[in-house]
C-alpha cells in the first residue's frame, strides 16, 4: 500500500498540476472534490492534505469549505491560494476583497524560517531577506491571521502571502507553487510532501505495471474488451497494458478514418499484430468519415461527429466479431487511452468543477447509448507517467516518446471543412516537418529538435495565397507549422526552432507538396492559445 496525499479540489483549472508535482516526487496522490464526506477522508488515510485554489471568493461562497475531518486527522495540511483563504476562515482568521488584485508574476519575501520555506529562495535582498519568484492569481486578501498562525511570506501589496502553524503542520501560501512560473514551486511541494508529511516516495511506473494489471483483471473479470487503437502514445500504452492483463480477450479495432498521419496504418498493424501478437482488426472507414464531415466547419461539431462515428464503428465491429464465431463472445467493455489532461480540458475531472475549454474526443464522443462499460486504465496518469509505463511494458522507445496525436486526428488540424484532398496535402507536409525535426540536432544539448519539442505538427489553412514558381503564377494553399515545449501540456511555450530548420522545412514542403505555396510558423503560447488550433 502506497502512502497517499489527498488533494481537495475547490475548482481551480490547474488543480491537476498539484497532482503532477506530487507524482513527480514519486508519491501517490488523488484529487477529490472539496465536499467529500468526513468518513471518506478518514478511510482514505492520507499522510497529508493539499487544498487547491478556486475561481470562487472565500467571503462570498460560504459553502465552499474543507470538510471538518481535514482539521481532525492530525496530518499536515497545505493551502494554496483559495485553499489558504478557506484555512484562514475555518481556523478563525479573516479574509476580505483586496483593492490590489495580483495576477501574474510577483516576488515574495519569506519570513520566520519555517520548515516549508527554510533554505528555499531564488535570490536575497541587500538586507538579507530571502525572495521567491512566484505566480499569483487572487482577488482576496487575508486581513487577520487565525490563532496560532504566524506570518510566513509577504509582498508589498499582499502583507500576508503565506502563513504557518507549525505545531499542527498547517501551512498556506497565496501563490501557486504547482505552476512552472513559480521557480521554486516543485521544491516547496516536495518539502511538504516528503519532509513535512513524511510520505514515502514509492510511486514508480515500473512497479505500477503489476498494480494496473491487477486492477484491470479485477474490473474486467472474465469479460472481453474492445479498444480503439489509433497508434498514438496513449492508446498504444493502454492496449499493451490491457493485453498484458487479459491477453486475447482484448480486441483492438484500428479505425482508419482517413485522418491519420502518413503511413500510420501500416505501422500500427506491424507493431501490434506483428510484434505484440495482439488481436487487431483494421477497419477502412475513410469514406464514411469524409462523407459525414462534408460541409461541417465548426470544430466542436467535427469532434462530435468523429466521436459519434467511432462509437458506431465500434458497435458494428463488435457485432461482426460476435457473429463470426471466431472465439469472440462479444465485448462488454470499451477501453480508451484517456489521461489526466484529456479529462481537464473537457471539464470532466472527478470533481466536475473545472470550466470546459473544448470537448475531448475520448470523453465527449461517447453517448450513454453506447451499451459498453468504460475501461480507462490511464485516466489518472500524466503523459510522462504514461510514457514511463510504456517503457516498462516493453514498447519501443520511438513509439512511446512519439508526440501526442489528437483522437480526431487531422480532423482538428484542418481548419474548417475536412476534405480528402486537404488531408492528403497535410499528411505530406506534416511528415516533412517531423522528418526535419528528427534529423536536426541542437549542438548545445546533443538532442534532436524532435526530442526538444513536446508536440509538433502542421496545420492546413483553407485559404489560398499567390506565389511564383519558375516563371508561372501559383494560387495554392497555406500550412502553418506548430511546435511547442511544455512539461505538463497545461501551459506551453512556442519552440524557438532554428531559422535554418524552418527554412529547410518550408522549402521542402513548397517544392515537394504540389498544392501548397506558403508556410507560416505559429508563435503563440498556451495560454492564451491552445496547443491544437481546433
Swiss-Prot record:
Pfam families: GATase, GMP_synt_C, NAD_synthase. Keywords: ATP-binding, Glutamine amidotransferase, GMP biosynthesis, Ligase, Nucleotide-binding, Purine biosynthesis. Residues 4-202 form the Glutamine amidotransferase type-1 domain. GO terms for molecular function: ATP binding; GMP synthase activity. Pathway: Purine metabolism; GMP biosynthesis; GMP from XMP (L-Gln route): step 1/1. ATP binds at residues 230-236. Transmembrane segments: none annotated. The active site is at 81 (nucleophile), 176, 178. One of its GO terms (cellular component) is cytosol. It is an enzyme of class 6 (ligase). It catalyses: XMP + L-glutamine + ATP + H2O = GMP + L-glutamate + AMP + diphosphate + 2 H(+). Residues 203-402 form the GMPS ATP-PPase domain. It comes from the Bacteria. Its EC number is 6.3.5.2. Catalyzes the synthesis of GMP from XMP. Homodimer. PANTHER family: GMP SYNTHASE [GLUTAMINE-HYDROLYZING], GMP SYNTHASE-RELATED. This is GMP synthase [glutamine-hydrolyzing]. It comes from Methylibium petroleiphilum (strain ATCC BAA-1232 / LMG 22953 / PM1).
Amino acid at each position: 500500500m502506497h502512502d497517499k496525499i489527498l488533494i481537495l479540489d475547490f475548482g481551480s483549472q490547474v488543480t491537476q498540476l498539484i497532482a503532477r508535482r506530487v507524482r513527480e516526487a514519486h508519491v501517490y496522490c488523488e484529487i477529490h472534490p472539496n465536499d467529500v464526506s468526513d468518513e471518506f477522508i478518514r478511510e482514505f488515510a492520507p499522510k497529508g492534505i493539499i487544498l487547491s485554489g478556486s475561481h470562487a471568493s472565500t467571503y462570498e461562497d460560504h459553502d465552499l469549505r474543507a470538510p471538518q475531518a481535514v482539521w481532525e486527522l492530525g496530518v499536515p495540511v497545505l493551502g494554496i491560494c483559495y485553499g489558504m483563504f478557506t484555512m484562514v476562515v475555518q481556523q478563525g482568521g479573516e479574509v476580505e476583497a483586496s483593492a490590489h488584485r495580483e495576477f501574474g508574476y510577483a516576488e515574495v519575501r519569506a519570513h520566520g524560517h519555517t520548515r516549508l520555506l527554510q533554505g528555499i529562495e531564488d535570490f536575497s535582498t541587500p538586507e538579507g531577506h530571502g525572495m521567491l519568484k512566484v505566480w499569483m492569481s487572487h482577488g482576496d486578501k487575508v486581513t487577520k491571521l487565525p490563532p496560532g498562525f504566524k506570518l510566513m511570506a509577504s509582498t508589498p501589496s499582499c502583507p500576508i502571502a503565506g502563513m504557518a502553524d507549525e505545531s499542527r503542520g498547517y501551512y498556506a501560501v497565496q501563490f501557486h507553487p504547482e505552476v512552472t512560473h513559480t521557480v521554486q514551486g516543485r521544491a516547496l511541494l516536495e518539502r511538504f510532501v516528503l519532509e513535512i508529511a513524511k510520505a514515502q516516495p514509492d510511486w514508480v511506473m515500473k512497479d505500477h505495471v503489476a498494480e494496473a494489471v491487477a486492477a484491470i483483471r479485477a474490473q474486467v473479470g472474465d469479460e472481453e474488451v474492445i479498444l480503439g487503437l489509433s497508434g498514438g502514445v496513449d492508446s498504444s500504452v493502454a492496449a499493451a497494458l490491457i493485453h498484458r492483463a487479459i491477453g486475447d480477450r482484448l480486441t483492438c479495432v484500428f479505425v482508419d478514418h482517413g485522418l491519420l498521419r502518413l503511413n500510420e496504418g501500416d505501422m500500427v498493424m506491424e507493431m501490434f499484430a506483428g510484434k505484440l501478437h495482439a488481436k487487431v482488426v483494421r477497419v477502412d472507414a475513410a469514406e464514411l468519415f469524409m462523407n459525414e464531415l462534408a460541409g461541417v466547419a465548426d470544430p466542436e461539431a467535427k469532434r462530435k461527429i468523429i466521436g459519434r462515428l467511432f462509437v458506431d464503428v465500434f458497435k458494428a465491429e463488435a457485432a461482426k466479431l460476435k457473429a463470426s464465431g471466431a472465439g469472440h463472445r462479444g465485448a462488454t467493455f470499451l477501453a480508451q487511452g484517456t489521461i489526466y489532461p484529456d479529462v481537464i480540458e473537457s471539464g470532466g475531472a472527478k470533481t466536475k468543477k473545472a470550466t470546459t475549454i473544448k470537448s475531448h474526443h475520448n470523453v465527449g464522443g461517447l453517448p450513454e447509448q453506447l451499451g459498453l462499460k468504460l475501461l480507462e486504465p490511464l485516466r489518472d496518469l500524466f503523459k510522462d507517467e504514461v510514457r514511463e509505463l510504456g517503457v516498462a511494458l516493453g514498447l519501443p522507445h520511438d513509439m512511446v516518446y512519439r508526440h501526442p496525436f489528437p483522437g480526431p486526428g487531422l480532423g482538428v488540424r484542418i481548419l474548417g471543412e475536412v476534405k480528402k484532398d486537404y488531408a492528403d496535402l497535410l499528411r505530406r507536409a506534416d511528415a516533412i516537418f517531423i522528418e526535419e525535426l528528427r534529423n536536426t540536432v541542437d549542438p548545445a544539448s546533443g538532442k534532436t529538435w524532435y526530442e526538444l519539442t513536446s508536440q509538433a505538427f502542421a496545420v492546413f489553412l483553407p485559404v489560398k495565397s499567390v506565389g511564383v514558381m519558375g516563371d508561372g503564377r501559383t494560387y495554392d494553399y497555406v500550412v502553418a507549422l506548430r511546435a511547442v515545449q511544455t512539461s505538463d501540456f497545461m501551459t506551453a511555450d512556442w519552440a524557438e526552432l532554428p531559422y535554418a530548420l524552418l527554412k529547410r522545412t518550408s522549402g521542402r514542403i513548397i517544392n515537394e507538396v504540389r498544392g501548397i505555396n506558403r508556410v507560416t510558423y505559429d508563435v503563440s503560447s498556451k495560454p492564451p492559445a491552445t496547443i491544437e488550433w481546433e
